[in-house]
């Protein structure tokens, strides 16, 4: 058994796994039968364990390592900040925090002026909801069934998927169906029909819930964990129009889709819409240090000039996280990482995935933007029957064994590599998909 050296001590995968299972309590799982993958290190788009096994990362972990692992510029900025000031309370003014906020505001469309920093996407959504309620004096929040907004009180209640059910204690949350033409709730046959019917349905929800009671509509610009559900043309503009008509704050969750993932700094830019609040995390500094935030439009920022904002976090704007944000944004600009996500995603990855769909009947649909793509796997294209959990687990295991880390959710594979990935690495990943799908061809009826 090959052993890696860690802090001058030989370490094996088994030792690390045993330590984990003895003391670590994992999220979203039953603890008894867990067998976590052991990771020792990473660089760029690749990871490895303590025994020499390597993987190409097509997951970006939880869709956050947009700039790749161990980027030297980000590491250097973090080291410099460590030597200057490692922590400071959020009530102070700090250079790293101010520079990070300015860079984020500068990336946004005209009309945004302030950033409230959090530690992750969940508390970003939590505080955006709080801002909307304080700003409007209203209570209700509308959000989609096909969504995930985080695992804190209001964020998990706003979430639409199964994870909200055992945690649904927060008040004032109403859910609605967002567009998903492949499995339309509106019996639509075209994107235009899906858009029109989804907007008409949302209008009725607003009317029935009482417009003067609704503080916010919270949507992911492109629902991520729910399936990378790219909204049909005109839908987001229609939601913006409804929000304007009824005086509702529009919050767009860019936690997963933002900071280059779709080939633009913010996914909503491609839909021709500007929200009132934007929540972000993940790609803002690639998860090197936990960070998130709320990007605040000028009218809402001005409101809190003379109205008290009842919210805060001990580690809001942590200097180490802020230094990582500044370096990440600067490096992404200079190295044209966002442009790479657009070109590699739309011109290399997407055509490659579509070619796989032509070859393998278990692929029911390919969808996405940039390096935010999804494969929906089915046993019957005609019936759109999802592959079972057991089948998906087997496919995920085969991909891992072949050297590819995949992001698997229900019957889908989300193809979301770091935004620094090369065409050659995409070809390598597509070849692994091809070989594994061929092994499971019998699943398609």
Q: For the regions a protein language model found, what residue spans apply to each?
A:
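Conserved N-terminal phosphate-binding loop of PLP-dependent enzymes in the Aspartate aminotransferase
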Residues: 1-445
């Amino acid at each position: 058994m090959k052993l890696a050296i860690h802090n001058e001590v030989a370490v094996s995968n088994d030792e690390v796994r045993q330590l984990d299972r003895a003391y670590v309590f994992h999220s979203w799982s039953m603890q008894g039968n867990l067998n976590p993958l052991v990771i020792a290190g990473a660089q760029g788009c690749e990871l490895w364990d303590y025994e020499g096994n390597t993987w190409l990362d097509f997951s970006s972990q939880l869709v956050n390592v947009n700039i790749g692992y161990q980027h030297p510029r980000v590491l250097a900025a973090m080291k410099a900040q460590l030597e200057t000031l490692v922590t400071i309370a959020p009530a102070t003014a700090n250079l790293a925090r101010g520079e990070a906020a300015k860079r984020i505001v500068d990336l946004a469309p005209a009309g945004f002026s302030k950033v409230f920093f959090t530690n992750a996407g969940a508390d970003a959504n939590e505080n955006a909801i709080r801002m909307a309620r304080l700003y409007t004096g209203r209570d209700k929040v509308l959000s989609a069934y096909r969504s995930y907004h985080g695992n804190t009180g209001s964020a998990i209640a706003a979430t639409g998927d199964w994870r909200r059910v055992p945690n649904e204690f927060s008040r004032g949350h109403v859910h609605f169906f967002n567009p998903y033409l492949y499995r339309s709730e509106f019996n639509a046959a075209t994107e235009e029909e899906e858009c029109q019917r989804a907007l008409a349905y949302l209008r009725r929800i607003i009317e029935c819930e009482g417009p003067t009671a609704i503080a916010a509509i919270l949507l992911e610009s492109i629902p991520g964990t729910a399936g990378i559900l790219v909204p049909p043309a005109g839908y987001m503009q229609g939601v913006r129009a409804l929000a304007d008509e009824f005086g509702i704050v529009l919050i767009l969750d860019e936690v997963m889709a933002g900071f280059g993932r779709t080939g633009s700094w913010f996914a909503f830019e491609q839909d021709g819409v500007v929200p009132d609040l934007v929540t972000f995390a993940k790609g803002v500094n690639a998860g090197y240090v936990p960070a998130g935030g709320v990007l605040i439009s000028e009218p809402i920022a001005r409101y809190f000039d003379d109205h008290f904002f009842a919210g805060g976090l001990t580690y809001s704007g942590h200097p180490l996280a802020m230094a990582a944000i500044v370096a990440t944004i600067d490096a992404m600009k200079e190295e044209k990482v966002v442009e790479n996500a657009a070109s590699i995603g739309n011109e290399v990855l997407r055509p490659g995935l579509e070619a796989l769909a032509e070859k393998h009947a278990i692929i029911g649909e390919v969808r996405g933007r940039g390096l935010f793509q999804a494969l929906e796997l089915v046993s019957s294209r005609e019936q759109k029957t999802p592959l079972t959990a057991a089948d998906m687990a087997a496919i995920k295991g085969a991909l891992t064994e072949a050297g590819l880390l995949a992001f698997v959710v229900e019957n889908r594979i989300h193809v979301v590599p770091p935004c620094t990935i090369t065409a050659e690495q995409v070809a390598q990943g597509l070849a692994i998909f091809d070989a594994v799908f061929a092994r499971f061809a019998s699943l398609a009826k």
